[in-house]
Curated annotation (Swiss-Prot):
InterPro entries (alphabetical): Ribosomal_bS21 (IPR001911), Ribosomal_bS21_CS (IPR018278), Ribosomal_bS21_sf (IPR038380)
Pfam families: Ribosomal_S21
Transmembrane segments: none
Protein keywords: Ribonucleoprotein, Ribosomal protein
Chain positions covered by the region annotation Disordered: 50-71
GO cellular component: ribonucleoprotein complex; ribosome
Compositional bias ranges of the Basic residues kind: 50-59
Biased composition (Basic and acidic residues): 60-71
The keyword Ribosomal protein is annotated on this UniProt entry: yes
Protein name stated in the entry: Small ribosomal subunit protein bS21
GO molecular function, one term: structural constituent of ribosome
Length: 71
């Protein structure tokens, strides 16, 4: 869990913003969302494999677009 020490004469809003940023960097909210409901190991593997395929297709598409523009 990220911890933020409030500096002297620091407004609460600024400290809260620093805390939110540190939570975002640590991935706390993403972790909570992923653990909100139980996901079977097979479903998790299937979801991760589908995400990998999607990332690869996106990467290939970007490379093809880049190759077309170089003339």
């Amino acid at each position: 869990m990220p911890a933020v020490k409030v500096k002297e004469n620091e407004p609460f809003d600024v400290a809260l913003r620093r805390f939110k940023r540190s939570c975002e960097k640590a991935g706390v909210l993403a972790e909570v969302r992923s653990r909100e409901f139980y996901e079977k190991p097979t479903s998790e593997r299937k979801r991760k494999a589908a995400a990998a395929v999607k990332r690869h297709a996106k990467k290939v598409q970007r490379e093809q677009r880049r190759a077309v523009r170089l003339y």
